Swiss-Prot record:
It is found in: Cytoplasm. Keywords: Cytoplasm, DNA-binding, Transcription, Transcription regulation. SUPFAM superfamilies: YebC-like. This is Probable transcriptional regulatory protein SAR11_0592. GO terms for molecular function: DNA binding. Signal peptide: none annotated. The lineage of its organism: Bacteria, Pseudomonadati, Pseudomonadota, Alphaproteobacteria, Candidatus Pelagibacterales. Pfam families: TACO1_YebC_N, Transcrip_reg. The keyword Transcription applies. It comes from Pelagibacter ubique (strain HTCC1062). Its main location: cytoplasm.
Length: 241
């Protein structure tokens, strides 16, 4: 659960602070349980579950927690979760997309709307903000796995559109429909991945006035802290602040 390096899409990393670890594990466990419930409990046969487990391992979630989350999918068979998306605009009119996984959409909608209103922003309708983004398949690989030169060539050969490297990881971009095919090709050479996710990538990032950056950050962090919210994306650009 991390940010998009090139376009400054905000998808804040969870779990870096000890005080957030419990909340992070709770959200990861929910995703694992839902993925296991909706598909095969064998990660090899369930791409969503495989990605959820990969994210959990990247967050240093204990193996026992992962196994309990998978087992929980059978115990809580009567609990139905929905994937929901909310769109709107926050401080300084930054475009925001919120992805949630909830068993009570009325509660989640009320909470998300309240956060938008308190920030001085507004929650819009479907499509009101998402036209500012593209959905892409994003595969992240630790720099220790492979060099910049090697990963670029491998990514293109594997069917990716682009590969961007920074100080920490390689980010491979591809059409969302091709993400698992691209990863399957990469797995012939690479064993360990940081994450494999569909992300909302801004078409253009926008600058926020310096005196509003703190408010924008607080708004995004408050959204992400909601128990039902899994991911938060924005087109805000922090590089010039």
């Amino acid at each position: 659960m991390s940010g998009h390096s090139k376009w400054a899409s905000i998808k804040h990393s969870k779990g870096k602070a000890d005080k957030q670890r419990s909340k992070v594990f709770s959200k990861l466990s929910k995703e694992i349980s839902v993925a296991a419930k909706l598909g095969d409990k064998d990660p090899a046969m369930n791409p969503r579950l495989r990605s959820a487990i990969q994210a959990a391992k990247s967050a240093n979630m204990p193996k026992d927690n992962i196994e309990r989350a998978i087992a929980k999918s059978s115990v809580n068979s009567e609990t139905n979760y929905e994937n929901l998306r909310y769109e709107g605009f926050g401080p300084d009119k930054i475009a925001v997309i919120v992805e949630a996984l909830t068993d009570n959409k009325n509660r989640t909608a009320s909470n998300v709307r309240s956060i938008f209103v308190k920030s001085g922003g507004n929650l819009g309708t479907q499509g009101s903000a998402s036209h500012n983004f593209n959905q892409l398949g994003i595969i992240k690989i630790d720099k220790k796995e492979i060099s910049d030169e090697q990963i670029f060539e491998l990514a293109i050969e594997s069917g990716a559109d682009e590969c961007i490297s920074n100080d920490e990881f390689h980010e491979i971009q591809c059409p969302m429909s091709e993400i698992y095919n691209v990863k399957k090709n990469l797995e012939k050479t690479i064993a360990n991945f940081i994450s494999t996710e569909i992300e909302w990538v801004p078409l253009n990032s926008v600058d926020v006035e310096k005196d509003k950056v703190e408010a924008a950050l607080e708004f995004l962090e408050t959204l992400e802290d909601d128990d039902d919210v899994q991911s938060v994306y924005s087109n805000i650009n922090f590089k010039n602040n």
